[in-house]
Amino acid sequence: MITVAPFVSLRFQFPLYIINRSTLFFRERTQYLVYNTCHILRTTAKTMPVVAEYAKSNRSSCRSCSNKIAVKSLRLGLISKGRGGVDMTRWHHFDCFPTDSESIASVDDIQGLSALEKEDQDALTKLVEQCGKVPAKKPDEKKGKAKKHIMGPKGLTKAATSSKVIADNAKSSRSSCNRCSQTIVSKDLRVGLVTEDSRGFDITRWHHLGCFPIDFHPIDSVEDIGGYSSLEKGDQMELKYLAEVNKKDKTLIDDVQKMDEGDDEAIADNELTEETKKGKHSPVAKLVEQPGEPAKEDEDEESKKPASDEISEQKTKDVKNSPDSSKVISEYAKSSRSTCKKCSQTIAAKELRLGLVTRNFRGFDMKQWHHLGCFPVDSDPIVSVEDIGGFSELQSGDQDALKELVQQCGKQTLVDKMDEDNDDTEAKIKLTEETNKRKHSEVGEMVEEDESLTKAKQQMAKTHKVNMSESTSQVEVEAEITLSASDVKDKYRDANLLPKWKAFETVIFLERDDGLNDSEKIAAFDFDGCLAKTSVKIVGADAWSLMYPSIPEKLQSLHDQGYKLVIFTNESNIDRWKNKRQAAVDSKIGRLNSFIERVKVPIQVFIACGVSSSGGKGGKDDLYRKPKAGMWQLMKKHFNSGIAIDMDKSFYVGDAAGRKMDHSDADIKFAQASGLKFFTPEEYFIPSSTSPGT
């Protein structure tokens, strides 16, 4: 009787069958297997075992494409025997697995299948069905161009029959829009285009609702959208509107299709013609025309405009002229990805932001986010806080800030314009001069001091680095500030202060930093937005970064030249946040301490904690809050050892200069009121700028 037993060779890389006769014997030696005379039959190569799992790290590489396999992504491995009988696994991406050369008899042969998620198990089942099939050959581009498909955004084909549309609320913030490449925020409505690749697997391309290519993938009815019934009523209404817009815009879509059916040169010519026509009829082109110059377009050209252009223009006019075309919403930024429409700066996460919601000509809502101080109250006034969406969900301090903003609507903008009319400027100058005279008589100042202030005004107007007229620079008459030892406190209201920090009235100050020397030359700076990047809504001593890399070197150079460095900064949140005052104090002082430690230069600091009178409560402006010169006068009279200050050599640097993108003009007016030369941070800290101390 002959017994056939399978045997795995340690010497050879193929399976063996050993036919055992009565005379057959074998024994094992090191590294070799010795057989006596027997019949050894070689069989066909056995398929290598396949294992599937989620990558434990990102160190493995795909055997096919050589790219890294991301952690927690599905990977497939082919297990083979290496030298010495050690198992070796060759990992592949799921899409890179060689189905044409490696066959899998059944999905049950895949090791680790039961540990995978249901969706991945279904994908592997389809993969097993594809194993052994020869992939379709790609058309040879050299022999001739393949038949062109009408393409949409980012390569989406126009064939609606090969794709379907689904909609849901994003489960996380990991998905991104296929059209604009921006992240789709968690729980936001997203619309997916599901297509099938060459191997039969479904691929979903997600879009924002406003980014969905409705022109290339029309939606005839909401019943065609998968997952529609599970959405909230508001999201269902938006999808219904999307379907209605699709029906109304069929004429425009047909025009696009006809244009795309031509060859590349015809398409380019058509696009150039359309752009030329749009340029002629655009409002910008009309503004370029010189006054009195006759229009170049005649009635014949106007009558030749396509019907689609007329429809688009009519929709745009209807939206712009509609009284309810915009609304205001408020919320805390969910991330740091949004930017302010006015200043183009990033809106930090958890910071209060105001959104102006407008509707475009296709009926989609467009949100334009702004910082609180950048919101255009002059062009988009807010009648009442009840008109602000999300107002009730804000904290009490932010609700008070919005109430102040509403009261400013219709009166003035948050950012005063530098190009005011000459009549208004002269009126303000006269009013300021009369006020200064009254203050001067009340405090009984000497005539000589008034003359010195006039000289300081003239000197500041000559050396001012910002483009402003001489008539706008007014030095504020010094107020009587009396200070005694009993007036200095170790606490600010109910908040404790860190060591070396004291409080006087509405000012918190660091009088004597280690190594600080009083001087006739003062180099004064704002803190937030000038020396450090900070956010009001993010508290913490470490929640800041240097505004410019050259700051430590610049400050050290000024200290070496005998300047005393002083920081004058406003922080009204310390007064406004009654329930969180201690946190506000610790955050502000902690940041300043960290900054001083970072630059390694002794600095004197004054923090104005008072609130301005713009809140509508009828109170007066805080004496020490910029643009008032109270902090400068306090330092000059009581914290400079009686040394007279040389105004020609002293200066102030701040970011609130009243420019178009600045949040206010408090710094430039503070410099004017104090009689100091003024620089913006860009002028002073950028190496190409000319500034004192360089």
Curated annotation (Swiss-Prot):
One of its GO terms (biological process) is DNA repair. Keywords: DNA damage, DNA repair, DNA-binding, Hydrolase, Metal-binding, Nucleus, Repeat, Transcription, Transcription regulation, Zinc, Zinc-finger. Zn(2+) 2 binds at residues 177, 180, 208, 211. InterPro entries: HAD-like_sf (IPR036412), HAD-SF_hydro_IIIA (IPR006549), HAD_sf (IPR023214), PNK3P (IPR013954), Polynucleotide_phosphatase (IPR006551), Znf_PARP (IPR001510), Znf_PARP_sf (IPR036957). Zn(2+) 1 binds at residues 62, 65, 93, 96. SMART domains: zf-PARP (SM01336). Its EC number is 3.1.3.32. It holds the Pfam family PNK3P. Residues 266-331 are annotated as: Disordered. GO terms for cellular component: nucleoplasm. Residues 302-321 have a biased composition (Basic and acidic residues). Zn(2+) 3 binds at residues 340, 343, 371, 374. A zinc finger (PARP-type) spans 50-132, 165-247, 328-410. GO terms for molecular function: DNA binding; polynucleotide 3'-phosphatase activity; zinc ion binding. Activated by the presence of DNA. Stimulated by XRCC1. It is found in: Nucleus, Nucleoplasm. It catalyses: a 3'end (2'-deoxyribonucleotide 3'-phosphate)-DNA + H2O = a 3'-end 2'-deoxyribonucleotide-DNA + phosphate. Disruption phenotype: No visible phenotype under normal growth conditions. Loss of 3'-phosphatase activity and hypersensitivity to DNA-damaging agents. Increased DNA methylation and transcriptional gene silencing. Zdp ape1l double mutants are embryo lethal and cause DNA hypermethylation and down-regulation of imprinted genes in the endosperm. In the C-terminal section; belongs to the DNA 3' phosphatase family. Interacts with ROS1 (via the central region). Binds to XRCC1. Nick-sensing 3'-phosphoesterase involved in a base excision repair pathway required for active DNA demethylation. The N-terminal DNA-binding domain binds specifically to gap sites and sharply bends the target DNA. Lacks 5'-kinase activity but is capable of 3'-phosphoglycolate end processing. Inactive on 3'-alpha,beta-unsaturated aldehyde (3'-dRP). Protects partially genes from transcriptional silencing by preventing promoter DNA hypermethylation. This is Polynucleotide 3'-phosphatase ZDP. The gene is ZDP.
